From Swiss-Prot:
It comes from Xenopus laevis (African clawed frog). Keywords: Disulfide bond, Immunoglobulin domain, Membrane, Repeat, Signal, Transmembrane, Transmembrane helix. Expressed in thymocytes. The keyword Repeat applies. This is V-set and immunoglobulin domain-containing protein 1. Residues 20-233 are extracellular.
Amino acid sequence: MSFLLFITLGLSLTALSHCVQVTIQNPIINVTSGQNATLYCTYILNNQNKNNLVIQWNIFQAKSQNQETVFFYQNGQSLSGPSYKNRVTAAMSPGNATITISNMQSQDTGIYTCEVLNLPESSGQGKILLTVLVPPSVPHCSIRGAVETGHFISLLCYSEEGMPRPIYSWNRVENGLLKSTPSQMNQQKGSLIIGNLTDFEEGYYRCTASNNLGNATCELNLHTGGEGGVIAAAVIGGLLAAAIIIAIVWFLVVKRKQKKQLPPTKEMKTGGNQYMAVSGEANEPPKENLGASEPTETIQFHDHAENAANGETEEPTA
């Protein structure tokens, strides 16, 4: 048993002797947004031949959950990753792989890895958890529920930026003064629950998002007929617009159907194999044909009074 333990320890020491030793001075770093961050990393080589020396810094970003190269060095040449271009300064002295990153932003929060490789030795690495502290951004205030008397509603507040994570508080604004709200409030989620809305609860409300770097606020106007009235007006306006469009389409369809239902034009053959267009309605005889028709019989009557005076009678003549 002791013999096997001796062999195991011997193999472990042999492996360590052929591995680059990397030391991290500060494994946890907090830095304020906009400031510079220095990531200390030193190493010890067992093989003093540095022709195959490779130093690489990577980050696993907390926000995007992506891995990206921060800095790379090999054969006297160095380069920075796309997000860190012109932001990285490397020490590059013997045994020192320390880098300084300028103008830290919230997306720079993550786990940084310092890896040193010097073939034929195995690579060694160390990790740093870096957090960029950011004051809260201006929060977004919103209302959930119908803003009408007797309805159950809640107020919501959320900041997209902020590290440490902001806490939220709601207050009612009266004559420029902040009044506490007796309703249910969740400081972590930024929600304020108001049961059945009454006239007493109407007014202006302010949400404050804060952490140890600062605070930011937003306000909203809570009154019946406020946002609910705007939404109702928008819905009514949309319905009216839809009704107008439907009426126009219906009118055009009816007009098109009426045009299609008009009686077709008929053709009547006349002398000389010529055709003339006449309406499908009852036709009147052409005026020029009236003169060609036979004259009607005319009966003439003489004055009966004159004939009677003369004692004569006269038969009607054709």
